Structures are given as structure tokens and as C-alpha cells.
């Protein structure tokens, strides 16, 4: 091989190698920022992806959506710490959060929390979002929540009418 072709081959090989390394680093960085969406049942039992059941690992970042279990909200009087249970159609997952909860956060309402799985059924959230009206629900959660009766806030807090 003549020197000119050899030099050209080395330059092209180096360019391909640099581009491949850059693409690999970008994909690695993007994979670190992915927060997969789970329901409480999927956190405990795993999420079916094709033929494989994927169970989230302790330490994994994720988003979880479900209904806040009535009577499960526990607030710390000394700080902004709060914990509550989430449920869909199956197991219960406990969520801990340090901070102010959204104004629309209520027991029996749907929420989405972003955080880290710290135990098999416990999530340390760094963000909690409440749905903005009675009808909104993320599509993934709506699909999983079919069949669960939702009580509207007006019905939950209304007083019985007395007829005279």
C-alpha cells in the first residue's frame, strides 16, 4: 500500500473512531437521565416489556403514578417531611417527600412522583405532581387504572341533605 493511501486510511479510521466514541458517550449520558414510568404494581411485580419482565432495582430513578390511599398521609410537625401510600389495582408503595406538596394534593386523588427507589416498596421522591383537574390522568396511568372507582372531591366532602 502506498504511503498516501495508508495515511488516508488512518485519517478515516480515526474519524470513524471519534464519531463512534461521541455517539457512545451521548447514548450513555441520555440513559442516565431516563426516568421510566411505573405504577405501584409494576414497582413490586415488574413491568412487562415484550417477553421480559423488568423489575426496577434499588437506587434506580423512576416516576410512579397512582392514587393516594385515604388515611395514609403522615406529616412531620417539625419539618416539611411527608409520607403517603400509593395504590393502583394491586400492591401499595410508600412515597416519602421533603418539601411543599402541590395545592391539589389530596387523599384519594391521582399523583405522579419522581424519585429514587430506596427499598422494594419505598420511593424517596424529589418531585410530586398532582393532576390539574378531575379528568386529567397520564395515559400510562389511565390504562393501568381502568376499573378503579374514583371519588370526586365534591362527593367526598359533601354533607348529607336533610329533608324536612
Curated annotation (Swiss-Prot):
GO CC aspect terms: plasma membrane
* Cited Pfam families: CcmE (PF03100)
**Which residues are listed for heme binding in this entry?**
132, 136
MF terms per GO, please? heme binding; metal ion binding
Q: Which UniProt keywords apply?
A: Cell inner membrane, Cell membrane, Cytochrome c-type biogenesis, Heme, Iron, Membrane, Metal-binding, Signal-anchor, Transmembrane, Transmembrane helix
Q: Which GO terms describe its biological process?
A: cytochrome complex assembly
Gene3D superfamilies in the record, alphabetically? Answer: Nucleic acid-binding proteins
Name where it's found: Cell inner membrane
Question: Highest taxon of the source?
Answer: Bacteria
Q: Name the major location.
A: membrane
Q: Does the keyword Transmembrane apply?
A: yes
User: For this UniProt entry, which segments traverse the membrane?
Assistant: 9-29
Cytoplasmic membrane side? 1-8
Q: Which family does it belong to?
A: Belongs to the CcmE/CycJ family.
Role according to the record: Heme chaperone required for the biogenesis of c-type cytochromes. Transiently binds heme delivered by CcmC and transfers the heme to apo-cytochromes in a process facilitated by CcmF and CcmH.
Which PANTHER family does the record associate with it?
CYTOCHROME C-TYPE BIOGENESIS PROTEIN CCME HOMOLOG, MITOCHONDRIAL (PTHR34128:SF2)
Q: What protein name does the entry list? A: Cytochrome c-type biogenesis protein CcmE
Taxonomic source organism: Pseudoalteromonas atlantica (strain T6c / ATCC BAA-1087)
Amino acid at each position: 500500500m502506498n504511503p498516501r493511501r495508508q495515511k488516508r486510511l488512518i485519517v478515516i479510521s480515526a474519524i470513524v473512531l471519534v464519531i463512534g466514541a461521541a455517539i457512545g458517550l451521548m447514548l450513555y449520558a441520555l440513559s442516565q437521565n431516563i426516568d421510566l414510568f411505573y405504577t405501584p404494581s409494576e414497582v413490586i411485580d415488574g413491568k412487562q416489556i415484550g417477553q421480559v419482565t423488568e423489575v426496577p432495582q434499588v437506587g434506580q430513578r423512576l416516576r410512579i403514578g397512582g392514587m393516594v390511599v385515604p388515611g395514609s398521609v403522615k406529616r412531620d410537625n417539625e419539618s416539611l417531611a411527608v409520607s403517603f401510600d400509593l395504590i393502583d389495582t394491586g400492591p401499595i408503595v410508600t412515597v416519602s417527600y421533603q418539601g411543599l406538596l402541590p395545592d391539589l394534593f389530596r387523599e384519594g386523588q391521582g399523583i405522579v412522583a419522581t424519585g429514587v427507589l430506596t427499598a422494594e416498596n419505598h420511593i424517596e421522591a424529589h418531585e410530586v405532581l398532582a393532576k390539574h383537574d378531575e379528568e386529567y390522568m397520564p395515559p400510562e396511568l389511565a390504562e393501568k387504572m381502568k376499573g378503579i372507582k374514583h371519588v370526586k372531591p365534591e362527593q367526598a366532602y359533601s354533607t348529607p341533605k336533610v329533608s324536612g
